[in-house]
Structure formats: C-alpha cells, structure tokens
C-alpha cells in the first residue's frame, strides 16, 4: 500500500526496508500503474480482469461487470510508457514487512464501447429495427385492399346494371304521366257527351224526360285496363275526377228541375 493511506498504518518504530525482485538484474516480475479516464461502477471488483499487450505497446484491458449488467464486460484501450526512476512502497500489515519495488511502465487507457455491448447502442438498434418493420407493415396494409378490389370487368358490369335500373325507372315514370294525361282527357270528353245527351232529353218535346239512375261518369266512362303500377300512381287522381263528376251531375239536375217548375 502506498500514499497517505498507507502511511497512516506506520508507527514511530524503525522497520526494515527490503528491495523487491524488480531490482534484480534479471527481474522475475514487473510492476505497472494503470490510469483510467473513467471506471464505471458496474465493474465487479471481486473478479480478475485480463490485460493484453499488442504491437506498438498497445494495451487492452477487459474487466467483467456485475452479473446481469449490459454489456457483460467493460473494455479499455490505451498505451504504456516506461518509467525511469519511479518506485512503489508495498507494506504488508500482517507481517509488518516493507518492500520497495521499481515501476516498469505507466499504462493509460480509455473506456471503449464494444459493438453490440453498449446499452445505448442496443436501444438504438431496437429503434432501427422498429423503424425497419414499420414501412413493411404499412406497405402490407396499403397493398392488401388493392388485392381485394374488383376487376375492371366486374366494375363496368355494376355500372351498366345501375344505368339500366335508372333507365327503367324513368320509363315507368314517363308511362305513368302519359297514362294520367290520356285518362284525364277521356274522362272530360265522356262528361261533356253525357251532359249533351241529358240536355237533349230534357228539352225534346217528343221524348219523355228520363234520368239515368246510374252515375253519368260510371256509365259513360270507358273502361281501361291499366297495370298495377298505373293504378297505384293514379288512384288519388281518379278519386278527385269522380268527385268532380258527381258535383257537376247534381248541379245539372237542380237546374233542370228549376226550369220545369217555371
């Protein structure tokens, strides 16, 4: 142990200082110092790490993280430089031994991010995967209705059927109107002819006055055979025509009776 913390365990008595194996002509061990730019709290200090020295004095240090952490290891990379006159004092508190060792090199490393091991990178990859899946999903949603669309031939057939239905409806409406006009004209002409015949009977000196017990419009009106559609369309119109004919007949009868009394 070195530094002020190690000096706190020293008392005033004299101790024997020994030189370590690093001072031998052919040292069997070497001591190094490592300086980290940042050391995460996720590193498991109870486990051993791995130090590799490559070409050009490049150093790679791999330290395991706490179980369950992402990523499972933390990697540091840097370089080492040799020491010239630096030493380190090692104190064994169990035996009270003090040993001086010569430092071989100073290693300075920086934390790096291993591909696929960074938590931020993992989240970014998830977002990229989601963004990649979204266009594919939208394309499926957009293209699926197009497959269900009708073919051009079936679409033209539907349009043709609709046009034919509209034309048939227009023909029914026009035939209904023409039938109504012809029926109105026939009804009015029959009423006029009935009125003329009644006047001739009333003012003729030879023929007796005869009044038809039947309704003029019922006896003189021609019979028409109409379809069910025409009957439905003109039911109200026929009812109004019948009412007008009845009123006219009653009016003519009252006038003829007043003339005979005079």
Curated annotation (Swiss-Prot):
Q: Where is the composition biased (Acidic residues)?
A: 193-202
Stretches of the chain forming a coiled coil according to its record: none
Official protein name in the record = ELL-associated factor 2
Q: Which domain of life is it from?
A: Eukaryota
Q: How does it assemble?
A: Component of the super elongation complex (SEC), at least composed of EAF1, EAF2, CDK9, MLLT3/AF9, AFF (AFF1 or AFF4), the P-TEFb complex and ELL (ELL, ELL2 or ELL3). Interacts with ELL and ELL2. Isoform 1 and isoform 2 interact with TCEA1.
Give the family, as the similarity comment puts it: Belongs to the EAF family.
Q: What keywords would UniProt list here?
A: Activator, Nucleus, Phosphoprotein, Transcription, Transcription regulation
PANTHER family under this entry? ELL-ASSOCIATED FACTOR 2, ELL-ASSOCIATED FACTOR EAF
Q: What is its main location?
A: nucleus
Which residues fall in a compositionally biased region of kind Basic and acidic residues? 227-237
> Residue ranges under compositional bias (Low complexity)?
174-192
Q: What does this protein do?
A: Acts as a transcriptional transactivator of ELL and ELL2 elongation activities. Acts as a transcriptional transactivator of TCEA1 elongation activity.
Tell me a GO biological process for this protein: positive regulation of transcription by RNA polymerase II
**Tissue-wise expression:** Isoform 1 is expressed in ovary, uterus, mammary glands, brain, spleen, liver, lung, thymus, kidney, skeletal muscle, skin and testis. Isoform 2 is expressed in kidney.
In alphabetical order, the GO MF annotations are: transcription elongation factor activity
């Amino acid at each position: 142990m070195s530094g002020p913390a190690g000096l706190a365990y020293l008392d005033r008595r004299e101790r024997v200082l020994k030189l370590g194996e690093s001072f031998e002509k052919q040292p069997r061990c070497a001591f190094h110092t490592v300086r980290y730019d940042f050391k995460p709290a996720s590193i498991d200090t109870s486990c051993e790490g791995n130090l590799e020295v490559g070409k050009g004095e490049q150093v790679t240090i791999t330290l395991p993280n706490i179980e369950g952490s992402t990523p499972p290891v933390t990697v540091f990379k840097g370089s080492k430089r040799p020491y010239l006159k630096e030493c380190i004092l090692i104190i064994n508190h169990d035996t009270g031994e003090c040993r001086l060792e010569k430092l071989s090199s100073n290693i300075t490393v920086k934390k790096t991010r291993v591909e696929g091991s960074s938590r931020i990178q993992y989240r970014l990859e998830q977002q990229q995967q989601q963004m990649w899946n979204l266009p594919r999903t939208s394309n499926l949603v957009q293209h699926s209705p197009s497959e269900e669309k009708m073919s051009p031939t079936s679409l033209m057939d539907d349009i043709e059927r609709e046009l034919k239905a509209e034309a048939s409806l227009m023909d029914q409406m026009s035939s209904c109107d023409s039938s109504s006009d012809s029926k109105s004209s026939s009804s009015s002409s029959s009423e006029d002819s009935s009125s003329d015949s009644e006047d001739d009977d009333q003012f003729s000196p030879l023929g007796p006055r005869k009044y038809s017990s039947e309704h003029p419009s019922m006896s003189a009106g021609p019979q028409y055979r109409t379809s069910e559609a025409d009957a439905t369309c003109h039911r109200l119109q026929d009812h109004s025509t019948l009412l007008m004919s009845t009123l006219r007949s009653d009016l003519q009868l009252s006038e003829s009776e007043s003339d005979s009394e005079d």
